[in-house]
């Protein structure tokens, strides 16, 4: 289990001592060593969601399940924690891209981005932009060859060159509350104050390195 590639590539690792604490906590919660999708949603308090919101959470879980066996084991779980603690926005964008690329073909089309936007909208509430406005804005700015699809290179480079667009994308796909529960709610050595700012959780810093 957990032998797939890490979620975000070359990311900052959790210190060894903290990893041991995480491991004990994970095994206390999940004695089998595996977390199911239902347990993931229970952990986050995300029961009774509508279909669109459920789709978004399912996709988040699937990106954590790197070896695609239907479970999240400890190595996959700690990789997710590493991502949350990662300060490099480029690494987060790589994960965003993987999240939006629903069919896993290495590119994002308008329908995939639209589906994910609407799923997050159902989870987080109404956005400033309509789904159509958001999709048109993103593709107008960063679909360099106008083929109706975004490659990973186009996605990351486009965001790096347009801070305003980066802010819009970050806010429009803000699932920091979902991820923060994992980080703050399950790590004994960290603060668990629900009012903790996104910056302190490493989620609100929109910067490229």
Curated annotation (Swiss-Prot):
Keywords: Calcium, Lipoprotein, Metal-binding, Myristate, Repeat. Ca(2+) 2 binds at residues 101, 103, 105, 107, 112. Residues 187-209 are annotated as: Disordered. One of its GO terms (molecular function) is calcium ion binding. GO terms for biological process: regulation of signal transduction; signal transduction; visual perception. One of its GO terms (cellular component) is photoreceptor disc membrane. The modification Deamidated asparagine is found at residue 3. Ca(2+) 3 binds at residues 143, 145, 147, 149, 154. Ca(2+) 1 binds at residues 65, 67, 69, 76. CDD domains: EFh. Stimulates guanylyl cyclase 1 (GC1) and GC2 when free calcium ions concentration is low and inhibits guanylyl cyclases when free calcium ions concentration is elevated. This Ca(2+)-sensitive regulation of guanylyl cyclase (GC) is a key event in recovery of the dark state of rod photoreceptors following light exposure. PANTHER family: CALCIUM BINDING PROTEINS, GUANYLYL CYCLASE-ACTIVATING PROTEIN 3. This is Guanylyl cyclase-activating protein 3. The lineage of its organism: Eukaryota, Metazoa, Chordata, Craniata, Vertebrata.
């Amino acid at each position: 289990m957990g032998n797939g590639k890490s979620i975000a590539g070359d990311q900052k690792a959790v210190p060894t001592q903290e990893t041991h604490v995480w491991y004990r906590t994970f095994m206390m919660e999940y004695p089998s060593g595996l977390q199911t999708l239902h347990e993931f949603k229970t952990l986050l308090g995300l029961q009774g969601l509508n279909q669109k919101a459920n789709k978004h959470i399912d996709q988040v879980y699937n990106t954590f399940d790197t070896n695609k066996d239907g479970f999240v084991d400890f190595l996959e779980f700690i990789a997710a924690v590493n991502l949350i603690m990662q300060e490099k926005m480029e690494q987060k964008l790589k994960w965003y891209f993987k999240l939006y690329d629903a069919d896993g073909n290495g590119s994002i089309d308008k329908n995939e981005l639209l589906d994910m936007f609407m799923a997050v909208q159902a989870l987080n509430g109404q956005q400033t932009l309509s789904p159509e406005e958001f999709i048109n804005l993103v593709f107008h700015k960063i679909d360099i060859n106008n083929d109706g699809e975004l490659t990973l290179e186009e996605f990351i480079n486009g965001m790096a060159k347009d801070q305003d667009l980066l802010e819009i994308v970050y806010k429009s796909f803000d699932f920091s509350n979902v991820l923060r529960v994992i980080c703050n709610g399950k790590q004994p050595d960290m603060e668990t104050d629900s009012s903790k700012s996104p910056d302190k959780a490493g989620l609100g810093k929109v910067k490229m390195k």
